[in-house]
A protein has these predicted regions:
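Phosphate-binding loop/pocket of nucleotide- and phosphate-handling active sites
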Residues: 159-187
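Mid-domain beta-loop-alpha active-site segment that forms a flexible
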Residues: 141-164
């Protein structure tokens, strides 16, 4: 999928699962201009955005529209469940203040404090921290292994299903790190 826009790659994958699904592409990404159209009719938002502005605006509009949001980060299997369908839910479990949210919504670049709000650098793996430090020099973006991405997608789907079934799924951050659990079971 190198060189193929993320929206196109995902649309192709959806068509392979069920060619009768109706898919609407937003090739320009998620923007203020298309936010209301994008959110219209959604039951859940899955954040797979790379740009800080898009990540912030997804949360802003999810909260305005009362739509739960999920973000899976392949580092340590981190998964954020953000219950904007529940009253008074703060942005990213209170990790993003209203002032920081306003900054992020118009920002064109990542700042260290934005990275920390989204991934909590103190909890990131050593490999993840090294990758963050290399972005913009030897790396163009956050590296992700397919196995981690596939596992994360599965975890996100399980959470979404549980929410849709009416099970109690609180606003929270979880780490579902398989490698850590495997090492702990051996030791």
């Amino acid at each position: 999928h190198l060189g193929v826009p993320k929206a196109v790659a995902i649309a192709r994958a959806i068509a392979e699962v069920d060619p009768y699904f109706e898919v609407e592409l937003f090739t320009e990404g998620f923007t203020d201009e298309n936010a209301e159209t994008f959110m219209d009719g959604l039951d859940f938002v899955c954040d797979a955005c790379d740009q800080v502005r898009a990540k912030a605006n997804l949360r802003w509009y999810a909260k305005v529209n009362g739509i739960p949001l999920i973000m899976e980060t392949s580092d340590r299997g981190m998964i954020d469940i953000e219950r904007y369908d529940e009253a008074n839910t703060p942005f990213l479990h209170g990790r993003i203040s209203d002032d920081m949210m306003e900054e992020m919504r118009i920002s064109s670049a990542w700042k260290p404090e934005y990275f920390d709000a989204f991934i909590d650098v103190s909890q990131a793996s050593q490999r993840g921290v090294s990758s963050l430090q290399a972005i913009g020099t030897t790396l163009v973006g956050w590296p992700q292994l397919y196995t981690d991405v596939a596992a994360g997608g599965s975890h996100a789907a399980q959470v979404i299903r549980s929410v849709f079934l009416g099970e109690h799924v609180p606003d929270a951050r979880h780490y579902l790190e398989v490698n850590e659990q495997l090492l702990e079971s051996v030791n």
